[in-house]
C-alpha cells in the first residue's frame, strides 16, 4: 500500500512538472511515393481499384494532414506502423521527408514499423500496363531512415527487435513495441527461392521482458507510460483473436497481463484500419487500447490525444477532402463498399466450417430417431454460397462501413441492421440443412446456432467487448477520457 502511494505521489509530481501534453496519433498511413508510378495506366489503376485504401491519393493525403498537424502544434506525433504501401525504399524516403516538416517546427515524431514496412516483396513500380520489383528495406535501414523519429539520440533500444523506449517530453515515456515478423519474410530479390510475407504479429519473449522492465523503471521514477504497437493487443469485438487472428498479437492475453502488471495502462495501435477504443482488465486493473484507422481509408481518421495529470482524452478528426479531390470522403466510402463482397468469401469459408459442424450435430440427433437425410455439403456448396451473397452482401457492406466509422452502437441503424443480419444468417443456415425436416429446421437453428451468431453480431455492431458477460464494456470510439 505504501509503495503504491509513493508511486502515485511521484507520478503526480512529474505530471505537474510537465503539464498537459498534446499528441497526434495516426496509423496505417500506407504512403506510396509518386515516383513509383513511372507511367499511369492499367497496372496502377487495377491495383488501386482492388483495394479499400486510396492508394493513388496517399501521398497527397499525407502532405495535407502534415499541414493540418503543423497548424495544431502538438508536442508529439505518434504513428503506429504501416508507414508505406509495401515497404518501398522510395516510399519510406518520402514519409521521412514529410516527417521532417514536423521536426522543423519543433514537433517530436515517433514511429514504429508495421507488417508492410520491411522486407516486403510486394514493393513494386507501376509503368503503364506493367509492374516490376522495387527496392524494399531491411530492419537496419528502417532504423537509419527514421533515426530522428524514434531510433536515434538517447532513445533506449531493444537488441532483439525494433522496440524502443523514448522520453519525448519530460515525464512521459513512450514504449514503441515491434510486433512484426518481417525477419521471417523471404524475397527472391535477395536470393530466396520464394517470396513470403507475414501479416500476423508476435512479441518475442526477450522483447516482452525488455518492455516490462522499461515500463517498471519509468513508473518507479514517477513517469507516465504510453505504449504503441501495430497489432491489436485487445480484442475489439468478441472472438477477434479467432476470427481475425492475424490482427491480434499472438498470446495477447498474456501480453496484456504483463503490460498491465508493469504499469502500462494505455496503448495506441492500428493494423485493422478500424477506429475503435477498447478496454480490458486483469486483477482489477485495466489497459485501454486506442486503435486508429488507416489515414488513407474511409473514414480517414486521425486522433488528438491530450494527457493531463492522470487522464488521457481522445478526440477524433476526419479528413474530408484534399486539393485534387473535394469529394474524397464520398469516393473513399465507395472504395470500401466495392471491396467488401470479395472479403466476404473468406467469411463464407469460415461459415462453411460452422455449417458442417451444425449438420453433423443434426445428423447425430436424427440418428437417435432412426436416421434421416444428411446434407451433402460439397454438392450444395454453390447453393449455400449463392444464398450467402444474396442475403448478406449488402448488409455486410453497411456493417463494414459502420465498423470503420466507429461508435456502432450509437448509430440509429445499428439495431435494425443486427436484426437483418440475424435473419440473413438464419436463411443461409436453413439453406444448408436437410429440407425434409421442414419447420423443424428453424427451431433447430434458433436453439443451436443463432445465440452464438447474435452475440457476435451485437458485439460488433453495438461496440460491446465481452458482450453479455459481467466484464462487458463499451467505450466511446471517437471522444473518450479515461485514467491511465
Model feature map: region roles:
Residues 28, 77, 82, 95, ...:
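Divalent metal-coordination and catalytic microenvironments
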Amino acid at each position: 500500500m505504501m509503495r503504491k502511494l509513493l508511486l502515485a505521489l511521484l507520478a503526480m509530481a512529474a505530471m505537474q512538472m510537465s503539464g498537459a501534453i498534446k499528441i497526434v496519433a495516426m496509423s496505417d498511413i500506407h504512403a506510396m511515393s509518386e515516383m513509383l508510378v513511372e507511367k499511369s495506366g492499367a497496372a496502377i489503376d487495377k491495383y488501386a481499384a482492388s483495394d479499400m485504401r486510396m492508394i493513388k491519393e496517399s501521398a497527397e493525403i499525407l502532405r495535407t494532414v502534415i499541414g493540418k498537424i503543423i497548424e495544431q502544434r502538438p508536442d508529439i506525433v505518434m504513428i503506429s506502423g504501416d508507414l508505406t504501401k509495401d515497404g518501398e525504399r522510395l516510399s519510406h524516403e518520402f514519409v521521412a521527408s514529410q516527417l521532417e516538416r514536423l521536426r522543423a517546427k519543433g514537433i517530436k515524431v515517433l514511429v514504429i514499423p508495421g507488417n508492410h514496412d520491411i522486407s516486403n516483396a510486394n514493393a513494386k513500380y507501376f509503368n503503364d500496363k506493367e509492374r516490376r520489383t522495387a527496392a524494399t528495406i531491411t530492419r537496419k535501414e528502417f532504423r537509419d531512415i527514421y533515426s530522428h523519429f524514434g531510433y536515434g539520440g538517447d532513445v533506449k533500444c531493444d537488441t532483439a527487435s525494433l522496440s524502443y523506449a523514448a522520453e519525448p517530453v519530460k515525464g512521459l515515456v513512450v514504449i514503441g513495441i515491434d510486433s512484426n515478423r518481417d525477419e521471417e519474410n523471404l524475397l527472391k530479390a535477395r536470393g530466396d527461392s520464394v517470396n513470403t510475407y507475414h501479416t500476423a504479429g508476435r512479441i518475442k519473449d526477450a522483447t516482452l521482458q525488455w518492455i516490462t522492465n522499461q515500463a517498471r523503471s519509468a513508473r518507479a521514477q514517477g513517469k507516465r507510460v504510453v505504449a504503441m504497437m501495430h497489432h491489436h493487443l485487445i480484442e475489439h469485438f468478441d472472438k477477434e483473436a479467432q476470427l481475425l487472428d492475424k490482427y491480434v498479437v499472438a498470446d495477447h492475453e498474456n501480453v496484456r497481463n504483463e503490460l498491465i502488471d508493469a504499469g502500462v495502462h494505455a496503448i495506441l495501435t492500428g493494423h485493422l484500419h478500424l477506429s475503435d477504443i477498447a478496454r480490458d482488465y486483469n486483477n482489477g486493473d485495466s489497459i485501454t487500447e486506442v486503435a486508429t484507422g488507416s489515414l488513407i481509408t474511409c473514414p480517414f481518421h486521425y486522433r488528438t490525444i491530450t494527457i493531463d495529470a492522470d487522464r488521457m482524452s481522445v478526440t477524433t478528426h476526419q479528413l474530408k477532402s484534399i486539393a485534387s479531390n473535394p469529394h474524397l470522403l464520398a469516393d473513399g466510402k465507395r472504395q470500401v463498399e466495392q471491396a467488401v463482397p470479395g472479403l466476404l468469401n473468406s467469411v463464407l469459408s469460415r461459415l462453411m466450417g460452422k455449417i458442417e459442424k451444425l449438420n453433423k450435430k443434426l445428423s447425430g440427433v436424427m440418428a437417435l430417431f432412426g436416421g434421416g437425410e444428411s446434407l451433402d455439403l460439397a454438392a450444395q456448396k454453390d447453393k449455400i454460397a449463392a444464398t450467402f451473397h444474396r442475403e448478406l452482401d449488402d448488409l455486410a457492406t453497411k456493417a463494414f462501413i459502420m465498423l470503420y466509422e466507429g461508435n456502432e452502437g450509437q448509430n440509429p441503424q445499428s439495431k435494425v441492421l443486427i436484426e437483418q443480419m440475424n435473419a440473413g444468417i438464419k436463411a443461409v443456415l436453413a439453406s444448408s440443412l436437410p429440407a425434409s425436416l421442414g419447420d423443424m429446421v428453424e427451431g433447430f437453428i434458433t436453439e443451436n446456432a443463432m445465440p452464438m451468431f447474435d452475440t457476435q453480431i451485437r458485439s460488433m455492431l453495438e461496440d460491446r467487448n465481452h458482450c453479455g458477460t459481467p466484464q462487458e464494456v463499451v467505450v466511446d470510439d471517437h471522444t473518450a477520457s479515461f485514467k491511465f
